[in-house]
Amino acid sequence: MTVNMAYIGIIGGSGLYDLMPESTKKVIETPFGNPSDAVEIGEVNGVEVAFLPRHGKKHTIPPHKVNYRANIWALHELGVERIIGLNAVGSLREDYKPGEIVIPDQYIDFTKRRDLTFYDGPQVYHISEADPFCPEMNSILYDTARNLKIPVHNSGTYITIEGPRFSTRAESKMFRQFADIIGMTLVPEVSLAGELALCYSVIASITDYDVWSTKPVDAREVMNIMKQNDHKVRDILFNALPLIKKERKCSCSLRLDNAKM
């Protein structure tokens, strides 16, 4: 039975815990196993939200081991209809600079061995992913960042690689031909949200130029810039959440219409 606790879910890193000084933990069991951690229900700027740390509270789950199906299902069980994913990404363009924010509008799946669907049979659905992100939330997140004077790009193609390793230089140069940013955690999170007719948008914070640049990607450097970006992401969320209404005027809720075979 669905327990209506929050209509907005946030999936991201542990740096967001201080947004909710008081929260209630919900341990959710799903048909797909355990989520990354307990879901924290709390209030952010007057809005009830459900927060789930994608890699676990202590960041012990690598990107290719995240149980994306359980995470999305758990939020859905709590009554969440809109999800904001928080992602650290590398830049594949010189004009998309470390420290800046991207609100992506397209993605490319370059993962290899993840559970990609809720519908493995006997029910079969083929959802459209022509426009995978919620236009309503994308617009709110972009406008909020602009109003806060945070450097932000309102479009971008996000390529998701399997991880946990970073790209080779040859791979990175290839990816530059058809994507703008690169990361390890968007897919299948975004398409699974679509399979449950949920709204989904991403705040992607650029931590580095990918290895196509002259300097190789360094995990420690990425973490340092991530910490610097945390306050920008928190500011965007704090100001954007009250603008995201429960009533959905987008078409995300219709994603399953005519999708069943």
Curated annotation (Swiss-Prot):
Highest rank taxon of the organism: Archaea
Example of a GO biological process term: L-methionine salvage from methylthioadenosine
Catalytic activity: S-methyl-5'-thioadenosine + phosphate = 5-(methylsulfanyl)-alpha-D-ribose 1-phosphate + adenine
Pathway recorded for this protein: Amino-acid biosynthesis; L-methionine biosynthesis via salvage pathway; S-methyl-5-thio-alpha-D-ribose 1-phosphate from S-methyl-5'-thioadenosine (phosphorylase route): step 1/1
Site (Important for substrate specificity): 167, 219
Organism expressing this protein natively: Thermoplasma acidophilum (strain ATCC 25905 / DSM 1728 / JCM 9062 / NBRC 15155 / AMRC-C165)
EC number: 2.4.2.28
GO terms, molecular function: S-methyl-5-thioadenosine phosphorylase activity
Function: Catalyzes the reversible phosphorylation of S-methyl-5'-thioadenosine (MTA) to adenine and 5-methylthioribose-1-phosphate. Involved in the breakdown of MTA, a major by-product of polyamine biosynthesis. Responsible for the first step in the methionine salvage pathway after MTA has been generated from S-adenosylmethionine. Has broad substrate specificity with 6-aminopurine nucleosides as preferred substrates.
Cross-referenced Pfam families: PNP_UDP_1
Subunit description: Homohexamer. Dimer of a homotrimer.
PROSITE patterns: PNP_MTAP_2
Binding residues annotated for substrate, in chain numbering: 184, 208-210
CC per GO annotation: cytosol
Protein family membership: Belongs to the PNP/MTAP phosphorylase family. MTAP subfamily.
Annotated binding of phosphate, by residue: 14, 54-55, 185
Protein name: S-methyl-5'-thioadenosine phosphorylase
Glycosyltransferase found in the keyword field: yes
Matching InterPro entries: MTAP (IPR010044), Nucleoside_phosphorylase_d (IPR000845), Nucleoside_phosphorylase_sf (IPR035994), Purine_phosphorylase-2_CS (IPR018099)
Keywords from the UniProt entry: Glycosyltransferase, Purine salvage, Transferase
